[in-house]
A protein has these predicted regions:
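N-terminal, positively charged, Ser/Thr/Ala/Gly-biased leader segments
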Residues: 1-24, 139, 143-170
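Extended Gly/Ser/Thr-rich low-complexity repeat segments
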Residues: 135-146, 299-304
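Short, charged/polar, Gly/Pro-enriched secondary-structure boundary elements
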Residues: 131-135, 187
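Membrane helix-loop-helix hairpins that form the core translocation module of multi-pass transporters
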Residues: 120-130
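A glycine-rich beta-to-alpha transition motif near the start of alpha/beta enzyme domains, typified by
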Residues: 1-121, 178-304
Length: 304
């Protein structure tokens, strides 16, 4: 079967987009893995099928599949790219400036801006309210604090073979375990892949893979490691179902929420990822706003 596709990315978090408005495409886990393979396929962190929505207020439905074939509840960078795809392919009037996207989590209001060439370049996504209830995240870690009457998991210690780490848990439609590395120079040398103790040299592959599948997270989890700084929150992420990515929109939102809950950040801040920067605001109405770029890389046809 020949498949027409569009390769897109949001801060290096990249996706293979396939138009499935006829709802005629079903891809196996092996086919997804092939499309996402960076040596034998197109190369991506996941595949997004653009499908019609059953909701009259929504333009289209974003069906997101991780590179390992598992379904994802939500993807912040993906939904910005989804917006660009809809604008570029005339599913949305470029002058409209806003629309409502349908996702597995539900409808999300999105606004977007055009660049000097009339192309959509930046989108602001209303990512809905963070979920803090441990049972709904889900996590088996206990809630030890409350905010506005809602209990949340506040820096609970989780053991590992190499030492204990503390996690604050947030769901943005998908589960996140956020770990703050406040004093890198005080951490054990064996936690790093080089002699310089920086976020970039932190052994994310080892710790991310371990905690992603830890028994404390029955549905597995995305794992964020954060270094707070004067210029914002510096973040690396190990995504559930695909490993480290250059950026994670829901992870940036969850990390900002966790930083506010633990007193490390104001309600608006920049989150610096390996692929670039997102602007995140946890609004007073409890909804999280994410703003960042979306880019098309190339289009093509592939035999699967």
């Amino acid at each position: 079967m020949e498949l027409n596709f569009t390769k897109m990315h949001g801060l290096g978090n990249d996706f293979v987009f396939v138009d499935d408005f006829n709802k005629s495409i079903e891809l196996s886990a092996d086919q997804i893995a092939f499309l996402c393979d960076r040596h034998f396929g197109i190369g991506a962190d996941g595949v997004i099928l653009v499908r019609p929505s059953d909701r009259p207020e929504c333009v289209a439905y974003m069906h997101y599949i991780n590179s390992d074939g598992s379904l994802a509840e939500m993807c912040g960078n993906g939904v910005r790219c989804f917006t660009k795809y809809l604008v570029d392919h005339n599913y949305i009037d470029a002058d409209a400036g806003s629309y409502i996207a349908d996702t597995k989590r539900g409808p999300l209001p999105i606004s977007f801006k055009l660049d000097a060439n009339g192309l959509m370049s930046v989108a602001s996504v209303d990512m809905d309210m963070p979920i803090l209830d441990p049972e709904k995240i889900p996590t088996l870690l206990p809630a030890s604090c409350t905010t506005n009457g809602e209990s949340f998991v506040n820096e609970e210690v989780v053991p590992s073979p190499w030492g204990d780490l503390s996690f604050t848990c947030v769901s943005m439609g998908n589960p996140h375990a956020v770990c703050f590395l406040d004093n890198l120079d005080q951490l054990p040398a064996e936690w790093f892949t080089s002699s310089d103790k920086t976020l970039n040299s932190f052994d994310l592959e080892r710790f991310g893979a371990y905690f992603e599948s830890h028994k404390a997270f029955p549905a597995k989890t995305n794992v964020e490691f954060i270094v707070p700084a004067d210029d914002g929150l510096h973040m690396r992420v190990f995504e559930r179902g695909c490993g480290e990515t250059l950026a994670c929109g829901t992870g940036a939102c969850a990390s900002l929420v966790a930083a506010v809950l633990t007193g490390r950040s104001a309600r608006t801040n920049k989150v610096h990822l390996r692929g670039g920067t997102l602007n995140i605001t946890w609004q007073e109405n409890n909804r999280v706003l994410m703003t960042g770029p979306a880019m098309q890389v190339f289009t093509g046809t592939i035999e699967i």
